[in-house]
Amino acid sequence: MSDLQTPLVRPKRKKTWVDYFVKFRWIIVIFIVLPFSATFYFLIYLGDMWSESKSFEKRQKEHDENVKKVIKRLKGRDASKDGLVCTARKPWIAVGMRNVDYKRARHFEVDLGEFRNILEINKEKMTARVEPLVNMGQISRATVPMNLSLAVVAELDDLTVGGLINGYGIEGSSHIYGLFADTVEAYEIVLAGGELVRATRDNEYSDLYYAIPWSQGTLGLLVAAEIRLIKVKEYMRLTYIPVKGDLQALAQGYIDSFAPKDGDKSKIPDFVEGMVYNPTEGVMMVGTYASKEEAKKKGNKINNVGWWFKPWFYQHAQTALKKGQFVEYIPTREYYHRHTRCLYWEGKLILPFGDQFWFRYLLGWLMPPKVSLLKATQGEAIRNYYHDMHVIQDMLVPLYKVGDALEWVHREMEVYPIWLCPHKLFKQPIKGQIYPEPGFEYENRQGDTEDAQMYTDVGVYYAPGCVLRGEEFDGSEAVRRMEKWLIENHGFQPQYAVSELDEKSFWRMFNGELYEECRKKYRAIGTFMSVYYKSKKGRKTEKEVREAEQAHLETAYAEAD
């Protein structure tokens, strides 16, 4: 370990064939991954158009038929012979760093592949009822032309409703609406016994409603969700604010950009995002919805960031460090998906020249490479290399600890840029897996309200500085230290990422009381794998799965300090 004044000193690392393969992986990406990605995106687009051409009545009829198939499949499972229930989705399709190793053990597949339709957009109730495989690109394409939107639209097009609910989802509007699951009005779940139930905040299944988020699909199978809509305008008026100083100063500049010290709610923007480019420089962005008439007024600049030849968004934002604060108008849907084309800044590692003018104009229209195809074209050695030499982690920390988190990341990982996105963590009537610090409402900290503590997602996505310099780096050990720091600081780690937590530590980070009560009440034990074991790193044999499920009755979190 090191302290802030004494950085970690690492020896040089001997290169292997994997290093060279990763360095020249762009050849496979250009000639295989990008063409296939573009083809897949086009076919998916045609499928979405076909779905939208159907009447809502037709879509509902198909939905009902597919739900019956799921129920029949579950009821046909022999608990004494068949493995635990998993979806039939292939491991490489998921957008995440986990290997989905639990599917390597014998398991009982239930196919949810047909659940990809928008079932209803209700302008009176201001809700959208959608199936779990509807993705963010699909729903924003359907709603934004109506001047409507989900309250929280995760940035990457391929992220699905089911993943954002069962796992974790955030966006620049989360400082108002909370995480993606906080905007869901109702879940439609098929339970272990084949019963279809509708869970809301205030019906008989309210406990299930609060237990579903972060459960990774281990309480039941999500077949539909009713999600809150908000009214939006055609453009986002975006202000780029450069901030310079040490990491604590950057953190305070970020906090001040959206959380007024006087508590005046009229000063709170519609969207917030921060990017820290190095230990002394960052750019904070605040956005408010704007009409087409306002955007097109003389003197206002419109930036269509979605065009394939445009500079990558994070690099465009970085220009504020040289030219100072500036304002521009971005079409709303293009703003929502501003990080899709370059996958935040991971595109720079995948295609080192992908941000160059010539590439953007000639081949930029093929971007981004589909994450699932990137995973499908890497073997075990490459996958392990990324786990060891690369970081893709999110640290959810209380807002007042953002500066400490930035210092920790700099000291232990030295990864830049760093993404900052605030979100409310609501004090719920029933405590779920994640929850605010006890007594936060009495501290009157900047950004907090009576019903929610303000948190921030500190997004760490890139190769550490020591790896870029050819030095040694132990990715597993770094993640273990990160998880320890999060537990000590009442933070949380989204489980789409690779986790090194043992079971006891997992239930120190997360609250398992409601989850375990629902596992027993709705008979998920013996049918669905536990959330810890589903998130656990490494291969799993059928014997291990069975033993873990048996041991789950004596939960590790009951022993937690």
UniProtKB/Swiss-Prot annotation:
<dbReference type="GO" id="GO:0009808">
    <property type="term" value="P:lignin metabolic process"/>
</dbReference>
<dbReference type="GO" id="GO:0005829">
    <property type="term" value="C:cytosol"/>
</dbReference>
<dbReference type="GO" id="GO:0050614">
    <property type="term" value="F:Delta24-sterol reductase activity"/>
</dbReference>
<dbReference type="InterPro" id="IPR016166">
    <property type="entry name" value="FAD-bd_PCMH"/>
</dbReference>
<dbReference type="GO" id="GO:0016132">
    <property type="term" value="P:brassinosteroid biosynthetic process"/>
</dbReference>
<dbReference type="Pfam" id="PF01565">
    <property type="entry name" value="FAD_binding_4"/>
</dbReference>
<protein>
    <recommendedName>
        <fullName>Delta(24)-sterol reductase</fullName>
        <ecNumber>1.3.1.72</ecNumber>
    </recommendedName>
</protein>
<feature type="topological domain" description="Cytoplasmic">
    <location>
        <begin position="47"/>
        <end position="561"/>
    </location>
</feature>
<comment type="similarity">
    <text>Belongs to the DIMINUTO family.</text>
</comment>
<dbReference type="InterPro" id="IPR040165">
    <property type="entry name" value="Diminuto-like"/>
</dbReference>
<dbReference type="InterPro" id="IPR016169">
    <property type="entry name" value="FAD-bd_PCMH_sub2"/>
</dbReference>
<feature type="domain" description="FAD-binding PCMH-type">
    <location>
        <begin position="49"/>
        <end position="232"/>
    </location>
</feature>
<feature type="topological domain" description="Lumenal">
    <location>
        <begin position="1"/>
        <end position="25"/>
    </location>
</feature>
<dbReference type="InterPro" id="IPR036318">
    <property type="entry name" value="FAD-bd_PCMH-like_sf"/>
</dbReference>
<keyword id="KW-0492">Microsome</keyword>
<dbReference type="GO" id="GO:0009826">
    <property type="term" value="P:unidimensional cell growth"/>
</dbReference>
<dbReference type="InterPro" id="IPR006094">
    <property type="entry name" value="Oxid_FAD_bind_N"/>
</dbReference>
<keyword id="KW-0597">Phosphoprotein</keyword>
<dbReference type="GO" id="GO:0071949">
    <property type="term" value="F:FAD binding"/>
</dbReference>
<keyword id="KW-0812">Transmembrane</keyword>
<keyword id="KW-0560">Oxidoreductase</keyword>
<keyword id="KW-1133">Transmembrane helix</keyword>
<feature type="modified residue" description="Phosphoserine">
    <location>
        <position position="2"/>
    </location>
</feature>
<dbReference type="GO" id="GO:0009834">
    <property type="term" value="P:plant-type secondary cell wall biogenesis"/>
</dbReference>
<keyword id="KW-0472">Membrane</keyword>
<dbReference type="GO" id="GO:0016020">
    <property type="term" value="C:membrane"/>
</dbReference>
<keyword id="KW-0112">Calmodulin-binding</keyword>
<comment type="subunit">
    <text>Interacts with calmodulin.</text>
</comment>
<feature type="transmembrane region" description="Helical; Signal-anchor">
    <location>
        <begin position="26"/>
        <end position="46"/>
    </location>
</feature>
<feature type="region of interest" description="Interaction with calmodulin">
    <location>
        <begin position="518"/>
        <end position="539"/>
    </location>
</feature>
<dbReference type="GO" id="GO:0005783">
    <property type="term" value="C:endoplasmic reticulum"/>
</dbReference>
<keyword id="KW-0735">Signal-anchor</keyword>
<dbReference type="GO" id="GO:0005516">
    <property type="term" value="F:calmodulin binding"/>
</dbReference>
<dbReference type="GO" id="GO:0005773">
    <property type="term" value="C:vacuole"/>
</dbReference>
<keyword id="KW-0256">Endoplasmic reticulum</keyword>
<dbReference type="GO" id="GO:0000325">
    <property type="term" value="C:plant-type vacuole"/>
</dbReference>
<keyword id="KW-0521">NADP</keyword>
<comment type="function">
    <text>Plays a critical role in the general process of plant cell elongation. Involved in the synthesis of campesterol, an early precursor of brassinolide. Required for the conversion of 24-methylenecholesterol to campesterol and for the conversion of isofucosterol to sitosterol. Necessary for both the isomerization and reduction of 24-methylenecholesterol. Regulates indirectly phytochrome-mediated light responses through the modulation of brassinosteroid biosynthesis.</text>
</comment>
